[in-house]
């Protein structure tokens, strides 16, 4: 597999490295101007949410060494100054959350990167969701986006429902775990005042572009979806509530059967299915993009249903970043 560089060693950057280790992918370089190599070792080894790293990690001669493999460490603020070529990094994961446009992310190419994958939604880069629209990828694309964790949960389920029952319109709510952008106690937050309220104390209504982004990866649904979020005081794992009006009438059992068929077939490993009496912590470190749970959903009639799907918004997403790179490499 092509060699990977990671820019930004935050929540997603570190978990992309864990996912790469699990999947046998080769990470050869990490850049973060705010964390030295010894602190990288500490942050990678210990994780309050996903637990201690099960392999070995150390700092040796300025390198980050994971399971015996040396990883070059850079500390550049400007992506244009990162010498990815010197470390052999070809595919760069842009996980700072800062350089999310094609223009900004393209600066990695100056340092020798061949392709850039933005681990966030992008205003102008082509967006891809594994299991949904990878066939739209073209080798001439230099910068792409892996969309958001919520879009990765929503899109595979929406694809199955639309392919089989025709979606007329959708309202989505994601009940979303806290993220690093939130405040531990009340503080200022620019234009969106309540986003600055204490994350541990509140259920906070928030905006999300995840539903509209589905229209970019499934063009047939463009303009048919929108949604919002509730940020809740849990550290990880979120859940999508999809309220759908169908074009073709179907019983709830028929919908369940089609989702299970997809989960066991073409979307295996991306879309999961469970009949268990689950709660959010049961999905910690789950590698699926989306796990459909029929017991939590309801049907009003054969054309109006509420569908529920869980996702580890950190680790499931990080696994898809590696899967996207693997797919790109197979086509480049």
UniProtKB/Swiss-Prot annotation:
Pfam families: Gp_dh_C, Gp_dh_N. Its main location: cytoplasm. GO terms for biological process: glucose metabolic process; glycolytic process. It comes from the Eukaryota. Disulfide bonds: none annotated. One of its GO terms (molecular function) is glyceraldehyde-3-phosphate dehydrogenase (NAD+) (phosphorylating) activity. The record marks 176 as: Activates thiol group during catalysis. NAD(+) binds at residues 11-12, 32, 77, 313. The keyword NAD applies. Keywords: Cytoplasm, Glycolysis, NAD, Oxidoreductase. Transmembrane segments: none annotated. Its EC number is 1.2.1.12. It catalyses: D-glyceraldehyde 3-phosphate + phosphate + NAD(+) = (2R)-3-phospho-glyceroyl phosphate + NADH + H(+). It is found in: Cytoplasm. Pathway: Carbohydrate degradation; glycolysis; pyruvate from D-glyceraldehyde 3-phosphate: step 1/5. One of its GO terms (cellular component) is microtubule cytoskeleton. The keyword Signal does not apply. The active site is at 149 (nucleophile). D-glyceraldehyde 3-phosphate binds at residues 148-150, 179, 208-209, 231. Homotetramer. Belongs to the glyceraldehyde-3-phosphate dehydrogenase family. This is Glyceraldehyde-3-phosphate dehydrogenase.
